[in-house]
Amino acid sequence: MTYHPKSDFIAVMMERGFLADCTDYQGLDEALMKGCQPGYIGFDATAKSLHVGSLIQIMMLRWLQKTGHKPITLMGGGTTKVGDPSFRADERPLLTPAQIDDNIAGIRKVFAAYIDYDSGAENAALMLNNEEWLDDLNYLDFLRDIGRHFSVNRMLSFESVKSRLDREQSLSFLEFNYMILQAYDFMELNRRYGCILQMGGSDQWGNIVNGIDLTRRVIDHEVYGLTSPLLTTSDGKKMGKSQDGAVWLNPDMRSPYEFWQFWRNTTDADVGRFLKLYTELPVGECDRLGALAGSEINAAKVILANEVTALCHGAEAAATAEATAREVFEKGGIGDDLPTLTLGAADLPASIVQLIVKTGLAKSGKEAKRLIAEDGARLNDAPLTDAGMMIEAGDLAAPIKLSAGKKRHALVQLG
């Protein structure tokens, strides 16, 4: 990218690695230079919490506000009833209105940690729900006034739809309507709130472009789209998942200690990149920390874990998590003679059952499986529920703790 931005927001997005594409860099840049501008990201309410995979979008909204603009978090109370088919292999299960409302209430909690809604400042954020304008739409009027602006040929060409059809997997008419509804959201946000920017992951490119085209055609306003990369770790894993499931942002679904441990276990090659994306440390410091090697990189991982946890759960929770980890892993707080199993690369992948036996926490594979089935086994203090879990080298970027009951523990590390 050779474009040299004038606005602080685009400069930050480029410098820290948030940008995958933009519909019009110069046009958006010039619009942002004119003063406080609203920009939004939509979040469908498919679960009671967002997970780490959504954190890059939340950080984009945070930077939008920090550079003087107005973030809008749009809750998909309406679109969740349809389901986004983008790059999904199957149709999402439909949720009831009560389930959607419960999910929105859960998701709402995390945003306040990152974005200011209550200061009364010009750039104070808005939280909106698209059911406000979608629930009362008249279907025939919508087809006549909005549907006529969409080409089915073009919609079929979008990669998010094309990939599904190429695999000969069903795409329901309900899901096919999702991109029209999301486009309508952008137009309504522009009409009601002057919103000029929609952001999202690169899988949302087609939906964003549809919204821009619809807004131009119907109300003749210029709006813009900006996408972030779909993030994977250096070993190709999808961001937001760990060996024991999704890394949720709400503390009642993933404890701050487990959240801290997820970041502490970052692969060496990802440290610098994640510091730029998920913290507010200066870029030069992120580069310096990311370039550390050997045992020194572990100090950078602790900084990463502390910074991200402090943003999400507060500085006190981050400090407590670090102290707990140090007590367990460094000071032997659960016994100075904590047994440690050191594995070589040739030993991996290894089954969790095999590791429980090798660490002496169970005498046999049968006993280890029974321990898991009876909720007596834990991995990094989280319940172990899958006896078929495999541990790979990437999972051992930092030592992991296995527990049997409350008093028997062991460490597994990569030698």
From Swiss-Prot:
InterPro entries: aa-tRNA-synth_Ic, Rossmann-like_a/b/a_fold, S4_RNA-bd_sf, Tyr-tRNA-ligase, Tyr-tRNA-ligase_bac-type, Tyr-tRNA-ligase_bac_1. It comes from Ruegeria pomeroyi (strain ATCC 700808 / DSM 15171 / DSS-3) (Silicibacter pomeroyi). Homodimer. The keyword Aminoacyl-tRNA synthetase applies. Transmembrane segments: none annotated. It catalyses: tRNA(Tyr) + L-tyrosine + ATP = L-tyrosyl-tRNA(Tyr) + AMP + diphosphate + H(+). It is found in: Cytoplasm. L-tyrosine binds at Y40, Y178, Q182. Coiled coil: none annotated. Residues 350-414 form the S4 RNA-binding domain. The keyword Ligase applies. The lineage of its organism: Bacteria, Pseudomonadati, Pseudomonadota, Alphaproteobacteria, Rhodobacterales. This is Tyrosine--tRNA ligase. GO terms for molecular function: ATP binding; RNA binding; tyrosine-tRNA ligase activity. Pfam families: tRNA-synt_1b (PF00579). Its EC number is 6.1.1.1. GO terms for biological process: tyrosyl-tRNA aminoacylation. A motif ('HIGH' region) lies at residues 45-54. The gene is tyrS. Belongs to the class-I aminoacyl-tRNA synthetase family. TyrS type 1 subfamily. ATP binds at K241. A motif ('KMSKS' region) lies at residues 238-242. Keywords: Aminoacyl-tRNA synthetase, ATP-binding, Cytoplasm, Ligase, Nucleotide-binding, Protein biosynthesis, RNA-binding. One of its GO terms (cellular component) is cytosol. Catalyzes the attachment of tyrosine to tRNA(Tyr) in a two-step reaction: tyrosine is first activated by ATP to form Tyr-AMP and then transferred to the acceptor end of tRNA(Tyr). It is an enzyme of class 6 (ligase).
